[in-house]
């Protein structure tokens, strides 16, 4: 679907003056996609399949979210090709996942997606000419899955074009569930955020989400929701 059509849906609610950035590309001083580091919630009891982390639902600020006891074990085939379809309340984004170059990150994303962790989660931070951020079950930028894992930086993966799927973090080795998709090249993020995918169809959707009217903290006034993430393994 063309970007022009998507933007027409929000024409009445998106005055140009609402754009956060005035320049066509982000400045190096722009605040990067962050996942505010919060105390890990204790997970002491719950259910788990054999070899899987224990899952427990906890109440946080009136929200009931899933928390896991540990990083999921490696379940993917790093020699295979994986794709993800992020179904949103607008339209879908199709993404190629880089399993061979960021195996831990892709494995984590697939685990959470298949477990329904992202279902109903909003894009809580959107910035025109920069990126859109999601993956926090609290919808505030402070939530996660209950664990953190290491970065995976690869020299051949860079923020050199729009559509990069990468992890938000609060510093080294603080990856969890929050991720972002870029809408322009963002080279100032190289070496700071793990890249683990690339949009292959639906860049206009990411662009449209970045342009919705937002309020304090770049939070959309009208929520844009992830309905689900479908994972496919291609031989």
Which residues does each PLM region occupy?
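Positively charged n-region of N-terminal signal peptides that target proteins for export
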Residues: 1-5
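Cyclophilin-like peptidyl-prolyl cis-trans isomerases
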Residues: 6-7, 15, 19-235
